[in-house]
From Swiss-Prot:
Source species taxonomy: Bacteria, Pseudomonadati, Aquificota, Aquificia, Aquificales
Gene source species: Aquifex aeolicus (strain VF5)
Protein's UniProt keywords contain tRNA processing: yes
InterPro entries, A to Z: APOBEC/CMP_deaminase_Zn-bd (IPR016192), CMP_dCMP_dom (IPR002125), Cytidine_deaminase-like (IPR016193), tRNA_aden_deaminase (IPR028883)
Catalytically driven reaction(s): adenosine(34) in tRNA + H2O + H(+) = inosine(34) in tRNA + NH4(+)
EC supergroup of this enzyme: hydrolase
Protein name in the entry: tRNA-specific adenosine deaminase
Limits of the CMP/dCMP-type deaminase domain: 1-111
CDD domains named among the record's database cross-references: nucleoside_deaminase
Amino acid sequence: MGKEYFLKVALREAKRAFEKGEVPVGAIIVKEGEIISKAHNSVEELKDPTAHAEMLAIKEACRRLNTKYLEGCELYVTLEPCIMCSYALVLSRIEKVIFSALDKKHGGVVSVFNILDEPTLNHRVKWEYYPLEEASELLSEFFKKLRNNII
């Protein structure tokens, strides 16, 4: 099981968010090849602006592993993490994040800011952009429907 497999699992989570009228972002956390947690955006459902897929996946992984640090774990997410989520990755000490679409408005990894490579922080998170057209298409479809008041 490689990057593409795990990103497709995250994409299934993003589709669940889409079906609920949430911004379609899905995330999973993997440790030693095992999926530890899965989540999708739940901001609308939970009425919580911090209920991003990454934040929920981090919380669940910490709970399951009974730790506040996710050393040796990787996050696979369908959209570049925002600034809040990027800093949460630093705080969680996760090893690496792999994302499949860029976020030109709110990206906290490479598109707008680069939190993960900030030299003044105590932890560096490796990152990789691994494009999956299906992730970008799902986001485009969602925002098109939102603009046309279909969602």
